[in-house]
Amino acid sequence: MTKKTIWVIDDDPIYQIIINKTIQRFGLFSAISTFKNGKIALDALLQLLDNDTALPDIILLYINMPVMDGWEFMEELGLIKPKFMKQIVVYIVSSSIALEDKNKSKSYENILGYLSKPVTVDDLISIASTV
């Protein structure tokens, strides 16, 4: 199985450190990049339009962030997705237990799951093995 690249889009710097260390410790992915909001991640995606190998395979996307939240990011991703030659899958990560967020996540075709914070090693193993 080829290891995949993963991006984490979340405004919590402590969570970013924890998930980064966990991913590195268990060696589940070939590379990890972190972004503090959807706008910065979207800009990075746009810069990589001509370089599919540098695009992420998986995005862990937090919903509630400043500048551009997770839902706004998903709307923008939907607009640029046809330009990618690579399939990018998204997992929503949330501390919210709101049913409407879970239901909304099901309306996006490239959202494969909804995970509660904190993301566990088992969650990451499952993601790495199914994508």
Predicted features by range, described:
Residues 117:
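A Lys-centered signature of the CheY-like receiver
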Residues 71-84:
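Short amphipathic alpha-helix used as the core "switch/output" element in two-component signaling
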Residues 62:
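Active-site residues of response regulator receiver
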Residues 34-47, 70:
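Helix N-cap/capping motif at the beta->alpha junctions
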Residues 4-14, 19-23:
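Conserved acidic segment of CheY-like receiver
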Residues 65:
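Receiver (REC) domain active-site loop signature in two-component systems and cognate sites
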Residues 72, 86-88, 96-113:
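Alpha4 helix (beta4-alpha4-beta5 surface) of REC/receiver domains from two-component response regulators
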Residues 59, 113-114:
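Two-component signal transduction core modules
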